[in-house]
Amino acid sequence: MNTKIIDGTYIAERIKKDITQKVYADMNMGKRAPGLAMLLIGNNPISKIYIAHKKKVCKQVGFKSFLYNLPITATKTELLQLINILNNDKNIDGILIQLPLPDKLNDIKILEHIIPDKDVDGFHPYNVGRLCQRSPMLRPCTSRGIMTLLKWYNINTFVLNAVIIGASNIVGRPMLMELLLAGCTVSITHRFTQNLQVYVKNADLLIVAVGKANFLPSSWIKPGAIVIDVGINRLKNGNIVGDVHFPSAYKRAAYITPVPGGVGPMTVISLIQNTLQAYHAHVCCDSKKKIHFKKF
């Protein structure tokens, strides 16, 4: 089978160049640079790597990034107070909280405290609700990135039988809504699903997001399927692998994303796209183009 590797790194770079041109065109017209605030609580080394990468991309596209690194001892009240300040800062277009939060702060109300028009992660109930109502505004980044990959490779999703493995709020559930909008018949599986193999073997489009290295046996994959691997797992030898065993899955799939270099870069560039979208809503003089959000 002539399998095609879906190159998320290449596509993200192409989108990055387009965003950079738009940002500098706006700035040449006298507008300010887009601003992204990033909140990091504690010193989780993996989280610090992710934040550093996001800051790097912001600089590359002409955004201003603002890092707020709170100590692990920070209280919920302190975090909410900071979010309030950023909500009202006219130079900030997007606010993201680097997950996971410490257990004592792992409260959905913290994410909900970000006003919807600055929720560039797309996690606020308002933005999730807009997606459910077929009128998306700021969309969850990973699912948006996956849809961009499919579109870039001219993959027609209409009437495909899609299966999502993993029902998280970050990936699985928003992915379900995106695929419904794209005309798929969608099944979403989770830890209580019985006979997972039956679902997988019937999938034309397979999205795997469970966070377990080489979780999915390649023998389950339908020949000619489209395989999107969201997992990022570090093995004991230091290698990074996905939830799907790539070498064997490659022999069965028509399209497949590698790990790394597939979905990961698209998640970051989708965050940048959301921030640019929010920025244009905040600075655009044409009120017809503004995003109008309900105040929470």
Swiss-Prot record:
UniProt EC number: 1.5.1.5, 3.5.4.9
Keyword Oxidoreductase tagged: yes
Pathway recorded for this protein: One-carbon metabolism; tetrahydrofolate interconversion
Residue positions binding NADP(+): G166, A167, S168, I232
Pfam families membership: THF_DHG_CYH (PF00763), THF_DHG_CYH_C (PF02882)
InterPro entries per UniProt: Aminoacid_DH-like_N_sf, NAD(P)-bd_dom_sf, THF_DH/CycHdrlase, THF_DH/CycHdrlase_cat_dom, THF_DH/CycHdrlase_CS, THF_DH/CycHdrlase_NAD-bd_dom
Entry-linked Gene3D superfamilies: Leucine Dehydrogenase, chain A, domain 1 (3.40.50.10860), NAD(P)-binding Rossmann-like Domain (3.40.50.720)
Molecular functions per Gene Ontology: methenyltetrahydrofolate cyclohydrolase activity; methylenetetrahydrofolate dehydrogenase (NADP+) activity
Keywords: Amino-acid biosynthesis, Histidine biosynthesis, Hydrolase, Methionine biosynthesis, Multifunctional enzyme, NADP, One-carbon metabolism, Oxidoreductase, Purine biosynthesis
One BP term from GO: methionine biosynthetic process
Catalytic activity: (6R)-5,10-methylene-5,6,7,8-tetrahydrofolate + NADP(+) = (6R)-5,10-methenyltetrahydrofolate + NADPH; (6R)-5,10-methenyltetrahydrofolate + H2O = (6R)-10-formyltetrahydrofolate + H(+)
Record flagged with keyword Amino-acid biosynthesis: yes
Family: Belongs to the tetrahydrofolate dehydrogenase/cyclohydrolase family.
UniProt subunit comment: Homodimer.
Protein name per UniProt: Bifunctional protein FolD
Originating organism: Blochmanniella floridana
Native organism taxonomy: Bacteria, Pseudomonadati, Pseudomonadota, Gammaproteobacteria, Enterobacterales
